[in-house]
């Protein structure tokens, strides 16, 4: 059973429609909405535009029309939507209802608008056209940033350069560069040496031999240093002499003697201390 749209396109239907319209003056829709001065006619033209939009939206659902036909239909629908908006503004100016607020928005909801495209919408199969599908795909979320603790977990010896020589590449390069630098330094030293000889200056080796060793210490100097007098901060004379370093045994004996003296001073009487000092003097300690 044929559809109504197919019946309307038959030759008999077109002929019958032509007979009905014969003798009538077909009124055309004004090009500009501002040219209409009657509210009923403005309502009529708005309804006519809505009917055309509905037909074209139904046609564009067929993906087999071809890319170029689908693009043309989508452009025509967007053009009619803009024209419908102009007529709604004109109806409001003529005292009619504000369709921008109270009118149905089903036609607008059928289209999908690309962000930043100034109201241009895609209907039906136009959404799946090449280059259009990518516009509606959401951008993938960026990978989450790693925290400082996660970054520190990946740090190893290689990060600090301890394993750079294991690849066997950098060592030969460094050796080659080192030889090159040494050769340049030798050439520079030879050039400076020849320049000094040309000016009649002595070589550095001869100058080093003639220099006096300031660190050499003779017996006379050591005796003089032992008896040298220097003034201190308080103005008193201080004698600097080289004394032998005591051994570990001598240090222990000195500590024992000091401990004995502290015990005698703490527990012995003055008479006993005097007797002890007298005995030490007689024995020659």
UniProtKB/Swiss-Prot annotation:
Region entry Disordered, spans: 197-244
Location, primary (coarse class): nucleus
Modified residues (Phosphoserine): 247
A single GO cellular-component term on record: U2-type catalytic step 1 spliceosome
Role: Component of the spliceosome C complex required for the selective processing of microRNAs (miRNAs) during embryonic stem cell differentiation. Required for the biogenesis of all miRNAs from the pri-miR-17-92 primary transcript except miR-92a. Only required for the biogenesis of miR-290 and miR-96 from the pri-miR-290-295 and pri-miR-96-183 primary transcripts, respectively. Required during the transition of embryonic stem cells (ESCs) from the naive to primed state.
Assembly notes: Identified in the spliceosome C complex. Component of the XAB2 complex, a multimeric protein complex composed of XAB2, PRPF19, AQR, ZNF830, ISY1, and PPIE. Identified in a pentameric intron-binding (IB) complex composed of AQR, XAB2, ISY1, ZNF830 and PPIE that is incorporated into the spliceosome as a preassembled complex. The IB complex does not contain PRPF19. Interacts with CPSF3; this interaction is in an RNA independent manner. Interacts with the microprocessor complex subunits DGCR8 and DROSHA; this interaction is in an RNA dependent manner.
Name the record gives this protein: Pre-mRNA-splicing factor ISY1 homolog
Species of provenance: Mus musculus
Taxonomic classification: Eukaryota, Metazoa, Chordata, Craniata, Vertebrata
